[in-house]
Amino acid sequence: PTAVEHVLTRWEEIRGDDSFAGIVALRGTDEHTPMGTWMPEGVRAVTLWDLHEKMGFRGDTSLIHRTEILRRYPFDVAPGEKFVAESSVWFLIDESYNMLADNEILTICHYLPDGLTQNFASNAKRNPIGYWKHKRYCAARSTTLKSRARETSLFLVGCMLAHQKGAISMAPSKALAVLCYPVALVARYTIFR
């Protein structure tokens, strides 16, 4: 009930600091239960990439961005498609800005049985070009072998769904793409069937 007031108060901490794109807070099933983990202790300035990939945060966030920054990063939806992962824009913003970490639940929500989270595979099938482009970016940016392998496998799945030729040569690591290809092939015909 006090989310707007809370955001305005936290905003004062970063007003005028051009290194911040906005605030990253939590979503929860109620005011006391986050949809995932709490923010890591002691974190103030963070990128969304580091929050998830380096600090182990899992779950949904409430994002409040400066409007003038969002306008500079339009969503790159492929022709004929209707969706691209929001994180494709958030991760690009990360390259130039931090977010103020806020360990407060600002949004209360619940997953729908037919929502994006539950139907990520069918969404990737309907929007394969945007999917493989996003996963290629994530594979290139990943810093651990596990993360690079996961994202490379999903990039290859996206290429298969889009009938994109030359996927291995387009991968950030061709050697890893060759190793991940069998995994991607299995995923394509099981999870993404």
Question: Where do the PLM segments sit?
Answer:
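Conserved nucleotide-sugar donor-binding catalytic segment
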Residues: R27-Q118
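Structural register within alpha-helical repeat arrays
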Residues: R148-G158
